[in-house]
């Protein structure tokens, strides 16, 4: 990990980064030049998003073609797009007629949640149909699988 970049102050993350000797920077506005400059300064090759809710500017995407990975807390493409994050996604899943939910790890492109899907992990909604139960199980899957997918994609360089 060459850099952790946040859109908000985060004392716990800052403390973790100091302990791990990882640079930590806060940029609270999405200006592609500022993000590009910080990534270039730290010689970043891959960008991993987690909990990043803003649209990524095209100039930033162009600077990291097929090298921006995001996680989505539902199975795409059905529960994706602008406004589909956090509890909004879990509420939509809970109110739907689907029998499964899960997570999607995907590349980022110019459209919300439309990049190439790298991996999906699903679970049955049987006995887990409340928003809270869905959210809880999604978090378990995120913690278990997101690091594994990132590692395998970066090590294998499967994206060309």
Residue ranges and their predicted role:
Residues 1-160:
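One-carbon transfer enzymes
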């Amino acid at each position: 990990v060459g850099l952790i970049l946040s859109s908000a102050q985060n004392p716990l993350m800052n403390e973790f980064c100091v302990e791990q000797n990882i640079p930590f920077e806060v940029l609270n506005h999405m200006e592609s030049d500022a993000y590009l400059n910080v990534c270039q300064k730290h010689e970043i090759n891959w960008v991993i998003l987690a909990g990043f809710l803003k649209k990524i500017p095209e100039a930033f995407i162009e600077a990291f073609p097929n090298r921006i990975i995001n996680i989505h807390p539902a199975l795409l493409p059905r529960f994706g797009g602008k406004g589909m994050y956090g509890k909004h996604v879990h509420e939509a899943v809970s109110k739907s007629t689907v029998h499964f939910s899960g997570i999607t790890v995907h590349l980022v492109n110019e459209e919300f949640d439309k990049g190439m899907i790298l991996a999906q992990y699903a679970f049955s909604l049987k006995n887990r149909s409340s928003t809270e139960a869905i959210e809880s199980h999604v978090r378990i899957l995120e913690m278990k699988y997101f690091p594994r997918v990132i590692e395998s994609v970066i090590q294998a360089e499967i994206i060309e």
